[in-house]
Amino acid sequence: MFHGAITAWEAGASGAGTTIAIVDSGIDTANSEFAGRISSASADVAGSRGVRNTGDDHGTQVALVAAAARNDYGVMGIAWGATVQMLRADTPGTCASADGCTFSDTNIAEGIDAAVGAGARVVNLSLGGEAADTNLRAAVARATSAGLIVVVSAGNDGQSTDPAIDPNNPDPFAVSLLQAGGGNVIIVGSVSSAGLVSDFSNRAGSSASSFLMAQGETICCVYEGSQIRVVDGFRTAVNGTSFAAPQVSGAVALLAQAFPNLTGAQIVSLLLSTAREGGAIGTDPIYGRGILDIARAFSPQGSTGLAGTSVAVSLDSVAGTTSGAMGDAVSGASLGTVMLDGYGRAYALDLGRGLRFGQARQPLLEALRAGARPTGFEAGDVSLAFSVDRRFGAVPLRLAPGEREQARVLASTLVTRIGNARELALGWNTSSDALAARLQKRREAQFLVAGTANGMFERPELGFAARQRFGGMGVTVSGGRSLVWRPEALRDRREDRLARLGVALDGHGGDALDWRLGLGLMREERTVLGARFADALGGGGATTGTIEPGVTWRPMRGWHVGATGSLGFTRVAGTSVAPGGSRLVSSSWAFDVARDGALIEGDRLGLRLSQPLRVESGGLALNLPVAWDYATQTARFGRVPLSLAPKGRELDAEVAWSARLWDGAFSASLFWRRDPGHFAAAPDDAGGAVRWTAGF
């Protein structure tokens, strides 16, 4: 657990199908921890004794750390499914001596060559001593050139006081192999389970850039046959860099199995670059690159992107933020795909987990916050109007002779009549729809909550409208440009533009009926009905066509009955990830009944039932990589749909009364909202508001 191998195991890695070569003193072939996993290519490269050594268990202990079975007993190796190729290289007769086993450079070289011939991915050398001779160096060079990784222990002279020994560097044997094998050699020192350098371990020194630490202190356990040795009730543990090295060798096997595309040099790079800090930040002369961290080595590294594409993506990035019209559509959405990291390793990725709900509108709060007051003047056929915000104190403006106050101009409009039948309106920070409504003399009902809001946080920039009357009918052409922004724009600063163009025909059906029919076109640069999607989901951009009918009926004096609606058809811009076929249908509507002079002269009492803009059907038709073939280095793509139609449907009902009272404008409202924001799980929202405003 110390090195995070459980992450690899949970991902299905065990080292199965890979071979760990170990040049050492042999292995206990009868130990059930290795049952069925000792390679037939194992050999005694120093004689003809066989690989089983009854006089020394050093090689067995090394093999246990690297590859002991997952059998619910005793030791479990880092790569518990790997095949062990034991290459016995101890000089015959030396293991029985007082000084223990010795290994000649010639025999070690034979073992390394045998590992290359058997197709091993890593060779473990838990050995030490003097610098390697020319023959052994050449064998290491051949092995690393063939892609084999050489893992060698740093040495156990950390507490040595012998002037001929330098405990602050790996022993000469390890250093010489690093010099011979270069980038495919890792030297391994030892730390305790607390992550502290073991007293006995040689330090990284001048080999720090290729030096890893792994646990080599208090390593369980010594076996007798297939059973753990127990002495006086205690299990026997072992210490030494000899048992730190096979932890790294096991990690190599896990990576090689899980990611068959990796070269030896890439595996070494991964293990070194993902090591966790043990001492000073960065590479240091004690811990080298740090402590082996298998979990980090298995996590994506470097730049990441969708497999088989040039689309960048990351595990923690936001894949998309929906708009108000989409409500709870992406709740629980799953978009399984495949991502490659900087090493070309494939990972499963659920883009649905990166989808976020857009900030819900709070229509009552927005209405009550409004601090704008209109001001303007007319001169003949020209009128100029401003909306001024009292809440801002940045710019002093002279709004009228003798009037000074701290204010900000929120919007302005210029309307001019050209002849008797033609009008033109220009607006700054005013929507084209508002300009068109002004030219058409539409009297909009004043409701605080129940509207037909499109769910987009949209800020108009420039707008225009032109109207031509033909007898009892009129044609209005309007257009404008807006910014689609986020309420938290001060933090995000991201704004995308959209453009609108519309044409409407309006007329009268006698004295009691007004009607209009509009057609609209909206083009969004990077958004889809106000929603933003990352490049992994197509990146956004859409064109929406709308049909917008409306009718007002006056059945008797003072009464108004009206209905408006909008039906939209959206086509999302095609990309490599969303090549086409992404369509949405959306709608909004409102029904009004109003009475002028209901309670007092000049008042208006109204009732509205409405639905804000809602996606009725459709979504993104994505073409995402769903599998990766390491053999051919190609992705298999599949259709992955993302519905943007919410489960909830907001319905708003509001009763509103407005009148001139106490030298000001008074309004009162009672409202009820079902599924607010188009969220089916959201509780109903009901309330009321009273507002009185006056100018001073």
Q: Predicted segments — roles?
A:
Residues 24, 32, 175-253, 257:
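Extracellular S/T/G-rich loop segment that most often corresponds to the catalytic His/Ser-adjacent loop
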Residues 419-421, 470-473, 508-512, 556-558, ...:
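Outer-membrane beta-barrel channels and translocator barrels
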Residues 7-41, 49-104, 121, 132, ...:
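Subtilisin-like serine protease catalytic core
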Residues 437-456, 476, 491-495, 516-541, ...:
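Outer membrane beta-barrel transmembrane domains
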Residues 1-4, 113, 120-124, 184-187, ...:
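C-terminal subdomain of the subtilisin-like protease fold in secreted/lumenal serine endopeptidases
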Residues 14-16, 89-182, 226-245:
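Substrate-binding/access-modulating region of protease and related hydrolase catalytic domains
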Residues 65-66, 87-90, 121-122, 216-287:
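Hydrolase catalytic cores
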Residues 412-416, 464-468, 503-507, 547-553, ...:
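Residues on the lipid-exposed face of transmembrane beta-strands in outer-membrane beta-barrel proteins
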